[in-house]
A protein has these predicted regions:
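Amide-forming acyltransferase catalytic core, primarily the GNAT-like/NAT-type
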Residues: 1-49, 185-188, 201
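Acyltransferase donor/substrate-recognition loop-hinge adjacent to the catalytic core
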Residues: 111-182
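A mid-sequence, solvent-exposed acidic-amphipathic segment
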Residues: 163, 167-229
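Aromatic (often tryptophan-rich) hydrophobic motifs at membrane interfaces
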Residues: 207-294
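Short catalytic-loop micro-motif centered on adjacent basic/acidic residues
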Residues: 93-95, 159, 261-264
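Conserved donor-binding loop and adjoining core beta-sheet/short helix segment
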Residues: 29-101, 211-239
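Conserved active-site alpha-helix within GNAT-family acetyltransferase domains
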Residues: 102-116, 144, 269-285
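Short secondary-structure junctions
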Residues: 4-5, 26-28, 45, 111-117, ...
Length: 296
């Protein structure tokens, strides 16, 4: 069987060597992301012939989803994945496939899999220019929303993340959790946000805090997927301030124009979140698929 281990901070830079970041756009290829959510989603990886295999495990440590291997011997690693699944429990599912991954898998193993779309996991990707400028008729409503915010709240301040305002960013995140106490992700998000702030200097983490009347009311954190794609890992705001999400989104995008694209991640199957992400006119919706062996 493959020997899986949980991702540690010391693994992040080593694992990056196996990804072709000229092609990567998905948030699942952001290894800082994998590290931050390692406990919540029990994310592990194994090496095989200069190739890595990432998996998601159940609480009992059984594997529920294999990711597409990446490295020099993808086909060989997939054959090893098939053996591994059979030796463990016979539960083979390859998850989070992009259209490109799906095509590669089908070419390597024609007719072996059925493919099930996973829309709740698709990434919404925008040009940084669109989010920073909100130019044109498509963004008319967004510009109006932001203008209304600034007319309503006259004492506002936007600060990029620094040692002096990390506490304020965490304060917003905690207040957001208190407003959303039915969200099972809440406590794990606070842990991940705190860890991400601690690692900001080492992994090119950027962020921002928005203030109204000197009170922190919104925060955001992001990290680099590739030299052309930036990932928005977290964005939290206090809902009593109408327009606050539009403002923090727009102001932070203005600091990211050196990147061609901004990935605002998935909608998790939440209709309200889906509507919000679509309202910003993504230029790419990165499809996701799960591959399940055909029944013989």
């Amino acid at each position: 069987m493959l020997s899986f281990k949980k991702i540690e901070q010391s693994d992040i830079n080593e694992l990056k060597k196996y990804y072709d970041y000229d092609e990567c756009m998905g948030c699942d290829t952001n290894l800082l992301n994998a590290y931050l959510w390692r406990n919540e989603y029990n994310i592990k990886f194994a090496f095989y012939d200069d190739t890595i295999v990432k998996v998601y495990c159940n609480p009992d440590e059984s594997v529920w989803g294999y990711c597409m291997p990446t490295g020099k011997n993808i086909k060989g690693a997939l054959e090893e994945v098939f053996k591994d699944a059979e030796e463990r429990n016979g539960n083979l599912q390859i998850v989070m496939l992009t259209n490109g991954n799906r095509a590669m898998l089908e070419t390597m193993f024609p007719g072996k899999f059925d493919y099930v779309r996973s829309p709740e996991n698709q990434d919404y990707i925008y040009t940084s220019r669109d989010l920073a400028t909100l130019a044109g008729k498509r963004f008319h409503a967004k510009r109006n929303h932001i203008s209304k915010f600034y007319r309503t709240y006259t004492d506002t301040r936007f600060e990029t993340l620094s040692d002096s305002n990390i506490t304020d960013a965490l304060t917003v995140a905690k207040l957001w959790c208190a407003e959303n106490d039915t969200d099972p992700e809440a406590s794990s998000e606070i842990t991940a946000i705190r860890e991400m702030c601690d690692l900001k200097d080492e992994y090119n983490v950027k962020g921002a805090v928005l203030y109204v009347d000197s009170k922190p009311v919104a925060m955001t954190l992001g990290s680099e997927i590739s030299p052309k794609v930036y990932d928005i890992n977290f964005e939290k705001a206090l809902r009593e301030y109408d327009g606050v999400y539009a403002v923090i989104n727009n102001e932070f995008a203005k600091t990211l124009t050196q990147y061609e694209y901004i990935n605002r991640e998935e909608d998790m199957g939440l209709e309200g979140l889906k509507k919000s992400k679509l309202s910003y006119n993504p230029v790419i919706i990165l499809d996701r698929w799960n591959a399940i062996p055909k029944k013989r």
